[in-house]
From Swiss-Prot:
Subunit structure: Monomer and homodimer. Part of the essential Sec protein translocation apparatus which comprises SecA, SecYEG and auxiliary proteins SecDF-YajC and YidC.
Cofactor(s) annotated in UniProt: Zn(2+)
Phylogenetic placement of the source organism: Bacteria, Pseudomonadati, Thermodesulfobacteriota, Desulfuromonadia, Geobacterales
EC number: 7.4.2.8
Cellular compartment(s): Cell inner membrane; Cytoplasm
Protein name: Protein translocase subunit SecA
Length: 899
């Protein structure tokens, strides 16, 4: 009540922000006549002028009005597109390091050019991040014309580029690319043996398109570069054969003499939890598995791995459905993105789940992988000095954006008022009744010529609807993961008269649906059918298509615009809003309605009891529907619960990943300093002194007399580490104390290093230290990541011992990290003293081998955090098992990183 009153008096935060920006818009508008009077050369010359003024100390904020005015005029001349006033506000929001929520069709692609152009003036680079290669290429080519017209360079980072091409594209003023490519390039750079091989040049400013998809939907999906293990895949086939012999049971509550008066009873061999997407063996199931696998105790420590694989196989059979969670294509299990419905070639579920699904489907099983480098999108994007984003749906997740990324959301007003009515949900008892109503609605709109976009949440549901429409004789397009190659063309024509388009989870985001059709897209299809056509014929066809689409546009507007039909509510309100947002662009008419049933996943798992009670109370008969504000509210509450739960999971993940992030920063910073050759000898001597200090502490106890120290072990350790023979008489030992021993060892070791440097020369000595240090860091960092994975797997069990798993994880991860640092230090010192180098060519050959290995990029796989197994994994090609290991150890891959 009080907050509502305050908002009425002083306005909401969003209103106050917009009020602050409108005067700057007026200033930009006042500069428009001045910019229009400039020649093309003079307008281009403004970029060089801005760069000079910036170099002399003028801030980007001070340059903003003029720079935006120049960019707007450049867009008008080169693209035939003039930025609207609300788009200027969007550009200012991005420049301020915030998220601009802009409705579909409001021109987010053009808005990004304002902030990108202004920030490129600094010369530090701007990254524009998109969700797929198609959009990255399209936007870089399209908007690149504007940047080129204004004297800036544009690059694009997509799959398939080599390092030289990537380096050139990152060196451009503005670089477009996908989140995966940017993240993997960062990880690969930090595995290289020369700064000259790095492709990225820093993290200055990023504009993330579809920011909700990248920073929220994919936040639980870490990027991981990994190599295969040498484990046998036979176990998956063996365990897969016993799963069909297990019977699914359920959990029942029965009366009992307990505090609550009830106890849980488990029937069958296993139970499933759909919310957690997990499956658990019952006592009866454990006995049956032990009998089938011929083992005595499934919970014996030696059989824990077998138990894990049984649970994963249960999940594969009971929870993961073909054509819903994955498809089988060309002998491969391909994951379906639960948010977009697209296939994700190369992504793999982690922790043996993908292998379990492969065994279930009878396809070839790929071996599991070991992590070599990893980062989450959350921590990758937080490295940028300034981060901003755009989306049509961010306000529902504003709290998460602020808490995790420190990003505020500004809702940008539409250029024209929104005319789309969103009708209340219609709810049926069964899915069959719901689909019948959906078909009836589609048929009604089709017969009058109004285009419809029908959203489904899975490939399976889209194909069911398609079959029902086919039986009714209604022509339509199906846009799901199986046809993602054509999605842009199909979506572009979804606003044509009588067009019926079924889309899985709004695949095709980033392509506008224009009422009446898109003439450019029609021309593209015509060109494919007429490859011999001349430029004059193409120009004539384009004009014909423009007239045709303009006439059809008016007809479709008169019919009510694009009608949106949702066939199921998603767990997130944001995904539902994305579907609705495809209609009503730029003031066009449109409408939307969702059809639901009590058998839908969201209602069945999270909210059906309350809705079912209301339907029973109102005596709703079969085939009848209910539309009521109470039910809409109940569904929204279920969605809010799921959103809050998912937010907690992502926050939980970042709390854990922050520990690893700090460790990763230390290691990667140290690697870069070594590659840059900064104080390499000094760093090595510090390592040497620390190693000596550790040895003295281990063998020279102050409470014992020097003659009682373990001189045999001490001498062996000193010789092993420093190649120094300790020759001390009893009299000399008797006079020593711990400090004296440490000083003596330091003097001898430093003198030995000096002699070695004199023999090799300072340059070659530093070269040797650098190569040995990098080798030690990379080998032990890889092992550390494996140890951290193992720590994560069991850390949740600490809660049973009344301990906080998060605090235990932080403490033990720190201990593991310090142990790794000591191992790196000792190995570096030992190798520098012992490695045999006779001439410069020896070490150059050693380094060249390492550089060559680093160029063979590893298998890049994105897998989920162990605690969130429902998330997928992404992969690229790796080195062979018998090739030299890319970590630089000199061993074969299968004997080193591939163990």
């Amino acid at each position: 009540m009080l907050s509502t009153l305050i908002r009425k008096v002083i306005g909401s935060k969003n209103e106050r922000e917009l009020k602050r920006l409108w005067p700057i818009v007026a200033k930009i508008n006042s500069l428009e006549p001045q910019m229009q009077a400039l020649s093309d050369e003079e307008l281009r010359g403004k970029t060089a002028e801005f760069k000079e003024r910036y170099s002399k100390g003028e801030s980007l904020d001070a340059l903003l009005p003029e720079a935006f005015a120049v960019c707007r005029e450049g867009g008008r001349r080169e693209l035939g597109m003039r930025h609207f006033d609300v788009q200027l506000i969007g550009g200012m929001t991005l420049h301020a390091g915030k998220i601009a929520e802009m409705k579909t069709g409001e021109g987010k692609t053009l808005v990004a050019t304002l902030a990108a152009y202004l920030n490129a003036i600094s010369g530090k680079g701007v990254h524009v991040v998109t969700v797929n290669d198609y959009l990255a290429r399209r936007d870089s080519e399209w908007m690149g014309r504007l940047y080129g017209f204004l004297g800036l360079t544009t690059g694009v980072i997509v799959h398939g580029l080599d390092d030289e091409q990537r380096r050139a594209n990152y060196a451009a003023d503005i670089t477009y690319g996908t989140n995966n490519e940017f993240g993997f390039d960062y990880l690969r750079d930090n595995m290289k043996f020369s700064l000259d091989d790095y492709v990225q040049r820093g993290f200055n400013f990023a504009v993330v398109d579809e920011v909700d998809s990248i920073l929220i939907d994919e936040a639980r999906t870490p990027l991981i570069i990994s190599g295969p293990t040498e484990e046998s895949t036979d176990k998956y086939y063996v365990i897969n054969q016993i799963i069909p012999r297990l019977e699914q049971g359920e959990v029942k509550e029965v009366e009992a003499n307990t505090l609550s008066g009830k106890k849980k009873v488990y029937t069958g061999d296993f139970t499933i939890d759909e919310k957690a997407k997990s499956a658990t063996l019952t006592e009866q199931g454990v006995s049956k598995v032990e009998k089938l696998l011929k083992i005595e105790n499934l919970y014996d420590p030696r059989n824990i791995e077998t138990l894990h694989h049984v649970n994963q196989a249960l999940r594969a059979h009971a929870m993961y459905r073909r054509d819903v969670d994955y498809v089988v294509k060309d002998g491969e299990v391909l994951i379906v993105d639960e948010f977009t419905g697209r296939l994700m070639p190369g992504r793999r579920w982690s922790d043996g789940l993908h292998q379990a699904v492969e065994a279930k489907e009878g396809v070839r099983i790929e071996s599991e992988n070991q992590t070599l480098a990893t980062i989450t999108f959350q921590n990758y994007f937080r490295m940028y000095a300034k981060l901003s984003g755009m989306t049509g749906t961010a306000d529902t997740e504003a709290e998460e954006f602020h808490k995790i990324y420190k990003l505020d959301v500004t809702v940008i007003p539409t250029n024209r008022p929104l005319l789309r009515p969103d009708y209340p949900d219609v709810i049926y008892k069964t899915e069959q009744e719901k689909f019948a109503a959906v078909i009836s609605d589609i048929k009604e709109h089709y017969e009058k010529g109004q285009p419809c976009l029908v959203g489904t949440i899975s490939i399976e549901k889209s194909e069911v609807l398609s079959e029902l429409l086919r039986k009714q004789g209604i022509p339509h397009f199906v846009l799901n993961a199986k046809q993602h190659e054509k999605e842009a063309e199909i979506v572009a024509q979804a606003g044509r008269k009588k067009a019926i388009t079924i889309a899985t989870n709004m695949a095709g985001r980033g392509t506008d649906i224009v009422l009446g059709g898109n003439p450019d897209s029609l021309l593209k299809q015509w060109r494919l059918a007429n490859p011999e056509a001349t430029a004059e014929q193409a120009a004539a066809m384009l004009e014909q298509y423009r007239q045709q689409c303009a006439a059809e546009h008016d007809e479709v507007v008169a019919l009510g615009g694009l009608h949106i039909i949702g066939t199921e509510r998603h767990e997130s309100r944001r995904i539902d809003n994305q579907l609705r947002g495809r209609s009503g662009r730029q003031g066009d008419p449109g409408s939307s309605r969702f059809y639901l049933s009590l058998q839908d996943d969201l209602l069945r798992i999270f909210g059906s009891e309350r809705v079912a009670k209301i339907m029973d109370f109102l005596k709703i008969e079969e085939g009848e529907a209910i539309t009521h504000a109470m039910i809409n509210k109940s569904i929204e509450n279920a969605q809010k619960k799921v959103e809050a739960h998912n937010f907690e999971i992502r926050k939980h993940l970042i709390d854990y990943d922050d520990v690893m992030n700090k460790q990763r920063e230390v290691i990667y910073t140290q690697r870069r300093e070594i590659l840059a050759g900064e104080d390499i000898r000094e760093s090595f001597l510090e390592m040497l002194d620390d190693t000596i200090s550790d040895i003295v502490k281990a063998y020279a106890f102050e409470k014992d007399a020097p003659l009682e120290w373990d001189w045999e072990s001490l001498s062996e350790t000193v010789f092993r580490c420093f190649s120094i023979q300790l020759e001390l008489s009893r009299e000399m030992i008797a006079r020593l104390n711990a400090d004296g021993l440490q000083k003596m060892l330091q003097e001898q070791a430093h003198e030995s290093i000096k002699r070695r440097a004199d023999e090799l020369g300072d340059e070659l000595m530093d070269h040797l230290i650098r190569v040995v240090m990098l080798q030690a860091i990379d080998v032990h960092w890889k092992d550390h990541l494996l140890n951290i994975d193992h720590l994560k797997e069991g850390i949740g069990l600490r809660s049973y011992g009344q301990k906080d798993p998060k605090q235990e994880y932080k403490k033990e991860a720190y201990q593991l990290f310090m142990e790794m640092i000591i191992r790196i230090r000792e190995e570096t010192v030992e190798k520098v003293f012992w490695v045999q180098i006779e001439k410069e060519e020896d070490i150059e050959e050693l380094e060249e081998e390492q550089v060559e290995r680093s160029r063979k990029m590893f298998k890049a796989i994105t897998v989920n955090d162990d605690e969130h197994p429902a998330e997928p994994a992404k992969s690229q090609k790796n080195a062979g098992r018998n090739e030299p290991c890319p970590c630089g150890s000199g061993k074969k891959y299968k004997k080193c990183c591939g163990k």
